[in-house]
A protein has these predicted regions:
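Conserved donor-nucleotide/metal-binding helix-loop-beta segment in metal-dependent transferases, i.e.
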Residues: 143-193, 528-578
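Short, flexible loop/turn elements at secondary-structure junctions
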Residues: 58-60, 257-262, 444-446, 523-526, ...
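N-terminal anchoring/stem segment of glycosyltransferases
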Residues: 11-12, 16-103, 379-518
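A short acidic (Asp/Glu
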Residues: 65-67, 88-90, 147-150, 267-268, ...
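Active-site-proximal specificity loops/subdomain of glycosyltransferases
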Residues: 85-133, 148-159, 469-555, 561
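Basic/polar, acidic-poor N-terminal "presequence/leader" segments
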Residues: 30-60, 181-214, 420-434, 439-441, ...
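C-terminal catalytic/acceptor-binding lobe
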Residues: 2-12, 25-37, 43-44, 190, ...
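Catalytic metal- and UDP-sugar-binding loop of GT-A-like glycosyltransferases, i.e.
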Residues: 137-141, 522
Length: 733
């Protein structure tokens, strides 16, 4: 066969609605009779083979290169242009130029095309739909991205990330580190001030998003203030942000992924570009309020860098009243249906004084029915599982590192706080951390220990670029951080039952998807020789050695170790292994097929590793207040930790067991440390060495520094070595 496009209703194949059975869609006609056009390169191309399409708008932004959209041959690329252009990069079997004349010729019997008076990207959408598209990416040439598939996680049915449901509007540019930048629609709606984000969010497992919105910097996507310019760069954090029902979002921040059920919402009115995008933003806002669609932002990396538009003031066309209008739109139907959708679209058109476009709406809905669209009108669900509150301030930290005066202020503030412990502390230096590829997770067991955070900041910011704290109460932390002026600190609530399940803190950290090679968790009372850890292999697990081995199934009512016979001990680990065994031999029912298969293969890997390391009838346990998980094991660790947490297995059992299930023990780095008990805890300096061990635990700061000897140890011995070694490491960078 030859490369070409399917002629829908050309001279060779005339299709009449009257002569067509109501049950026979256009796609079915294609299946029975496909007519192809042969272009000059004679390559085979049948559009209906593709289920995922990228529609590139070359009408509002001229296109000279679409190579950035063609990284994956599973996507068809249709470039919508007004007239033929010389586009050399659109030369593969998966790319086609679709001109206005081709649209009228090939789709001219569709009522939407008849209603159009000028070229429109609706032509590209319809071409994709009639050829059986299940996913459509709406893109433009000013933001060509490298990897559509992985950036938007199109192949996954679930993803992890953040859920935002706090303020009336969400500014994605602010979330990714730009305080004076906002989407074009917010300028039109005079909403630059109300779009200030809250830092309180939730770490969550996100359901499949109906609409996925890319966020990238370009003149088409954002506006920045002339009087307060900032660097046009987004912080390198990839976690998607799902938006709650009542929060306004922008559809003008980059490419948009529409899944099949959201195809009706792709309608654009015949109007100027900014009114088109404002219409789409407001329509999605109403549909989201009615819980018909769910929505998430994804940071995308354009192939070529760009900048925002710079404006002296807010937009000259203040339409803030429009938002009040659309917020009043309601649907009285108990069940969402096509009639409800029509009335909602009509309501948004009326709010924008575009009521004359009602005919286009009727044409669009008629064509969707004619094409054979069978989307679901069921209401979309918001995240409800595994919600853990987070005070998310990585963006503030990112901005602080680019602002010398703010950085100096925070450094001075932290140093001053630390002077309460050490009378003459060295000035804190946060400007050039030596470890930039590890996220440090610091455990704060009790609310009363939040006062140790300034000490943690003073010590660990010298080494680590990324730090997150995990403790029992988000509300208490926010109150404390406001009082202590620690607005750059990120904190997640993960201690739902004291310290017993604190291994889930790393799970939360992994779901944030920072650009790191691994995740190191430690308690606030662990004294660590970080300079010795910096050289360890970052593709291996690190965990303290020296485990106690025991028979998993042996019952001992006289057991001396209290936790073994408690609900978080033997019972929990036995139940976890029962689940693993069941999952390894069959695909579980009651979940999505993709997740069930993922669980099945994970269980097989876990049990295979565990059997070779120890044998499936035994477990090991020990205190694990310091450990590291490489990012290459991220997915397996998340599944393992959630499984053992589900069965309420405490950390001293769960983590040693998990590490044997994730990796062969030959590929594990076992840390050397001093674990202190009883009176030894009063004199930790007698067990400390700056070269032979990785850590000492516990070292209770307030208790140790109550004595002159203890204060000298912390302030003179330990910290002087800590600072010296950080400078040595920095010179090696």
């Amino acid at each position: 066969m030859a490369l070409g496009v399917i002629i829908l209703l050309g001279q060779q194949f005339f299709l009449s609605r009257k002569s067509m059975s109501p049950r026979r869609s256009i796609q079915q006609v294609y299946d029975s009779q496909v007519i192809e056009v042969t272009p000059t390169d004679n390559k085979t191309f049948v559009l209906r083979e593709f289920k995922k399409w990228i529609v590139v708008d070359a009408l509002t932004t001229p296109c000279d290169d679409v190579a950035g959209f063609m990284q994956n041959d599973q996507w068809a690329v249709v470039v919508v242009t007004e007239s033929p252009v010389d586009l050399q990069t659109c030369n593969s079997p998966g790319c086609i130029l679709f001109t206005w004349e081709m649209c009228k010729r090939d789709l001219g019997r569709l009522e939407t095309v008849q209603a159009l008076t000028q070229p429109s990207t609706l032509c590209g959408y319809l071409l994709a739909m009639v050829n059986g598209a299940k996913v459509i990416a709406d893109a433009s040439c000013d933001v060509p991205i490298r990897d559509m598939e992985n950036t938007f996680e199109v192949s996954e049915d679930k993803s992890s990330g953040l859920w935002y449901n706090t303020t009336s509007a969400f500014n994605p540019f602010e979330h990714w580190g730009l305080t004076n930048t906002y989407p074009h629609e917010y300028e039109l709606l005079n909403m630059s001030a109300p779009s200030v984000n809250s830092h309180v969010m939730y770490v969550s497992d996100l359901s499949s998003m109906t609409i996925k919105q890319g966020v990238a910097i370009s003149k088409k996507t954002c506006v920045t203030n002339l009087y307060n310019p900032e660097k046009s760069s987004l912080m390198p954090v990839n976690s998607p942000v799902a938006i709650g029902a009542n929060t306004l979002v922008s559809l003008q921040t980059g490419p948009t992924i529409f899944t099949y059920d959201s195809f009706p919402s792709m309608l654009l009115p015949r109007s100027e570009t900014r009114d088109q995008m404002l219409f789409r933003t407001l329509l999605i806002h109403v549909l989201k309020k009615m819980k018909v669609v769910n929505f998430a932002y994804y940071k995308v990396d354009p192939k070529t860098p760009s900048k925002c538009d710079v404006h002296e003031s807010a937009g000259d066309k203040d339409q803030s009243f429009v938002l009040q209008c659309v917020n009043s739109i309601e649907c009285d139907a108990n069940v969402w249906d096509e009639t409800c959708l029509r009335n909602t679209v009509l309501g948004v058109l009326e709010c924008l004084n575009l009521g004359s476009e009602a005919w286009l709406l009727n044409a669009w809905m008629t064509d969707l029915d004619f094409i054979g669209f069978k989307g679901s009108y069921e209401k979309a669900s918001e995240p409800t599982r595994n919600l853990f509150g987070i005070s998310y301030n990585f963006n503030k930290e990112f901005m602080m590192m680019q602002n010398n005066s703010e950085l100096a202020r925070v450094e001075q503030h932290i140093t001053k706080n630390f002077s309460r412990i050490c009378s003459s502390p060295l000035k804190q230096s946060m400007w050039e951390p030596v470890i930039t590829d590890i996220l440090l997770v610091v455990i704060i067991n009790y609310e009363t220990l939040y006062s140790t955070i300034p000490y943690m900041e003073y010590v660990h910011r010298r080494y680590f670029k990324y730090i997150m704290y995990c403790g029992p109460s988000l509300d208490s932390f926010v109150k404390y951080s406001d009082q202590a002026d620690l607005g750059h600190v990120t904190f997640v609530s993960g201690m739902t039952r004291s310290w017993l399940f604190m291994y889930e803190c790393v799970t939360h950290a992994m779901k944030l998807r920072l650009p790191v090679k691994g995740y190191m968790q430690m308690g606030e009372d662990v004294l660590v020789n970080t300079w010795l850890l910096a050289s360890l292999p970052k593709d291996q697990i690190w965990i303290p050695g020296g485990f106690t081995k025991r028979d998993m199934y042996k019952i001992n009512k006289l057991e001396k170790w209290y936790h073994w016979n408690s609900p978080v001990g033997q019972r929990g680990v036995i139940n976890a292994f029962a689940t693993l065994t069941n999952s390894s031999v069959s695909v579980p029912d009651g979940t999505s097929r993709a997740f069930a298969l993922k669980s099945h293969y994970f269980a097989k890997r876990f049990l295979s590793n565990y059997k070779s390391n120890l044998g499936v009838n035994y477990i090991i346990h020990r205190a694990t207040d310091l450990f590291y998980i490489p990012d290459v094991l991220r997915d397996d660790y998340i599944m393992a930790s959630e499984l053992f947490r589900q069965h309420e297995t405490m950390i001293e059992i769960a983590l040693p067991v998990i590490h044997y299930g994730l990796s062969n023990r030959k590929n594990v780095t076992y840390l050397k440390g001093a674990s202190l008990w009883a009176q030894d805890r009063l004199r930790p300096w007698t067990y400390y060495h700056d070269t032979g061990i990785h850590f000492v635990h516990p070292v209770k700061l307030k208790m140790v520094t109550n004595s002159t000897e203890g204060k000298d140890f912390i302030c003179e011995t330990y910290l002087s070595k800590y600072v010296k070694e950080s400078d040595v490491l920095r010179l090696k960078l």
